[in-house]
């Protein structure tokens, strides 16, 4: 029986029960904590990456924006870990589900907008009407800017979903082609398998880049509203 092309994106179950809870709780096990005075190389590397990410995200923010540092660092680690675990064979990638990505994007976007209207009300309202706009275009521009504001969380979620899903589908197709050619032509199989390895390396990079892009855009929205 041929496997459905989108079967890998279906929510998994264990003994008929949803495995989402186990999937969510598993990544923290990959980030060990040390009780020793001197950390080992793994924990030192993790701390260096967290400090580097925090520095990259927080340099542009003021005091109010820096209160989000823990949230943003946790977000990028969660998305990156989830994307990388999804590259394992027969695993499930939650970030291929638009519903999950919207559940991350909408609250974060709404939080930045609420902060903008609370602490910088005039500047937040000024975004709806650029300075120097001709009077006849004012109603149209207000509508356009309002629509663009509400599209931001959708763009965040769709971008992450589309990039991760496209990569997984391409890997699935090339992997299927490798298996199909294995009994027909050995040279063709080696070529396709080499392409599959290169694509896997590329997908690892995409998984990390998409986590960074998602978090960076949230950080930019926060910067605009604080």
Swiss-Prot record:
Pfam families: ATP-synt_A (PF00119). It comes from the Eukaryota. It is found in: Mitochondrion inner membrane. PROSITE patterns: ATPASE_A. It catalyses: H(+)(in) = H(+)(out). Its main location: mitochondrion. One of its GO terms (cellular component) is proton-transporting ATP synthase complex. Keywords: ATP synthesis, CF(0), Hydrogen ion transport, Ion transport, Membrane, Mitochondrion, Mitochondrion inner membrane, Transmembrane, Transmembrane helix, Transport. The keyword Ion transport applies. The chain crosses the membrane at residues 6-26, 68-88, 97-117, 138-158, 164-184, 189-209. GO terms for biological process: proton motive force-driven ATP synthesis; proton motive force-driven mitochondrial ATP synthesis; proton transmembrane transport. Signal peptide: none annotated. GO terms for molecular function: proton channel activity; proton-transporting ATP synthase activity, rotational mechanism. It is a multi-pass membrane protein. Subunit a, of the mitochondrial membrane ATP synthase complex (F(1)F(0) ATP synthase or Complex V) that produces ATP from ADP in the presence of a proton gradient across the membrane which is generated by electron transport complexes of the respiratory chain. ATP synthase complex consist of a soluble F(1) head domain - the catalytic core - and a membrane F(1) domain - the membrane proton channel. These two domains are linked by a central stalk rotating inside the F(1) region and a stationary peripheral stalk. Belongs to the ATPase A chain family. PANTHER family: ATP SYNTHASE SUBUNIT A (PTHR11410:SF0). Component of the ATP synthase complex composed at least of ATP5F1A/subunit alpha, ATP5F1B/subunit beta, ATP5MC1/subunit c (homooctomer), MT-ATP6/subunit a, MT-ATP8/subunit 8, ATP5ME/subunit e, ATP5MF/subunit f, ATP5MG/subunit g, ATP5MK/subunit k, ATP5MJ/subunit j, ATP5F1C/subunit gamma, ATP5F1D/subunit delta, ATP5F1E/subunit epsilon, ATP5PF/subunit F6, ATP5PB/subunit b, ATP5PD/subunit d, ATP5PO/subunit OSCP. This is ATP synthase F(0) complex subunit a. It comes from Pan paniscus (Pygmy chimpanzee). The lineage of its organism: Eukaryota, Metazoa, Chordata, Craniata, Vertebrata.
